[in-house]
Design a protein with these regions (language model features):
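Extracytoplasmic beta-rich repeat domains
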Residues: 22-23, 30-33, 45, 51-64, ...
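Beta-propeller domains
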Residues: 74-84
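Boundary at the C-terminal end of the N-terminal hydrophobic targeting segment
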Residues: 17-21
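Sec-dependent N-terminal signal peptides
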Residues: 4-13
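Short loop/turn segments that connect beta-strands within beta-propeller blades
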Residues: 83-87, 122-125, 166-169, 206-210, ...
Length: 371
């Protein structure tokens, strides 16, 4: 009986982690809890800038979208809600820089900030609902696991802990101690939370109990987050090396050293059926065979790539610090389309059916679509 209960619970955790976004919403950083950045919908054939709005302040945050509303933060500490036709609905002032994407869970928008506080506000009014305090800044996005009638919001902090709180009350459920800062967002798939940190360890945690099941010693800062697919975690480190790790067997399947030009990996891979795509501070977007790490193609831009790409079955969408938004062919890396935003972009795209949204570092939200 215990075996069958475990199988059912694993199914619930897996289904919940994959059901966080549909074609018309992007409620989490990277769209889904696995952080894989894959969408089923098509990108516009010839994207047009539909509108843009200057929101004040600079930002490294990325947008999320639910029910016709776009949410993001900025360095002034503002959490901003904008309708998908470009109207500001409300602002919540936290008083501390919001460096990562917020997340939407139910009727709440949940985000961390540089004062080390995880906050939940009402997504309609922006009213504060609860707050949870860690002992240092929160630089990454929160994520959520759901199992039956249980759920938890997980976020890493520079206090060396991964924290899990009740989404309704903000009360602590558990926390896991590491040996250095946690800069990225934890990924969730198949009943596992997987995250890295500046201690150079990739860690696997049980979401229900907070028990740390496995650690894989990478030996170099992991400044970003893994993307998960099946039993595999794909990620890069601060030295520019890219990895595929089997989190079930704790084996490194392949690793690709960084280029001679140097450059850290600050973004998260986008994981397709047979390939992964990842950008680097060396100005290249790389595409590798996901099974063996063979380089399939690379595309050079004119600036660092700090954000994370999004892909579908045929195309790759990404941004660069050169101020451009790009769409490439997934099969060959050839450029299909680009747009010059005129200012650096370090955030990652949010994609909904027929549209995508980009946030520039000078605080402009750009909406693209077919017409």
């Amino acid at each position: 009986m215990r075996y069958y209960f475990s199988i059912i619970l694993l199914f619930l955790l897996n289904s919940a982690s994959q059901a966080q976004s549909g074609n018309n919403e992007w409620p989490l950083f990277r769209g889904k809890a696995d952080l894989a950045g894959k969408v089923e919908s098509e990108f516009p054939l010839s994207p047009k800038l539909l509108w843009s709005i200057k929101t004040g302040g600079t930002t490294k945050s990325s947008p999320v979208i639910t029910d016709g509303t776009v949410f993001f933060g900025n360095d002034k500490g503002s959490l901003i809600a904008i309708s998908t036709d470009g109207k500001i609905l409300w602002k919540y002032e936290s008083g501390a820089s919001i460096d990562a994407a917020p997340m939407v869970y139910g009727k709440k928008v949940i985000f961390g900030s540089s004062d080390g506080i995880l906050r939940a506000v009402d997504r309609t009014s922006g009213k504060l609902l609860w707050s949870y305090t860690t002992d240092n800044q929160i630089a990454g996005s929160a994520n959520v696991w759901v199992a039956g009638n249980k759920a938890g919001i997980v976020a890493g902090s520079y206090d060396y802990f991964l924290h899990c709180v009740d989404p309704e009350t903000g009360r602590s459920l558990w926390k896991v101690e590491t040996e250095n800062y946690i800069n990225g967002t934890p990924a969730i798939l198949n009943g596992k939370i997987v995250f890295g940190g500046c201690d150079g360890m990739l860690r696997v945690v049980d979401p229900l109990t907070g028990k740390q099941n496995d650690t894989i010693d990478i030996g170099v800062y992991i400044a970003s987050s893994p993307a998960l697919a099946h039993d595999f975690a794909y990620f890069g480190d601060y030295d520019g090396t890219k990895y595929c790790v089997n989190i079930r067997t704790r084996k490194i399947i392949w690793k690709i050293p960084g280029s001679d030009e140097g450059g850290s990996i600050l973004g998260i891979p986008a994981v397709g059926n047979n390939s992964i795509v990842i950008g680097s501070e060396d100005k290249y977007l790389y595409c590798y065979n996901s099974s063996d790490g063979k380089l399939l193609w690379k595309y050079r831009t004119n600036g660092r790539i700090d954000g994370s790409a999004v892909l579908n079955s045929t195309k790759v969408l990404f941004t660069g610090m050169d101020g451009y938004v790009y769409i490439l062919g997934l099969a060959d890396g050839n450029k299909i389309w680009s747009f010059n935003a005129g200012t650096p972009i370090s955030s990652s795209p949010a994609v909904i059916d027929g549209r995508f949204y980009i946030l520039t570092q000078d605080g402009r939200l750009l909406a693209f679509g077919s017409n």
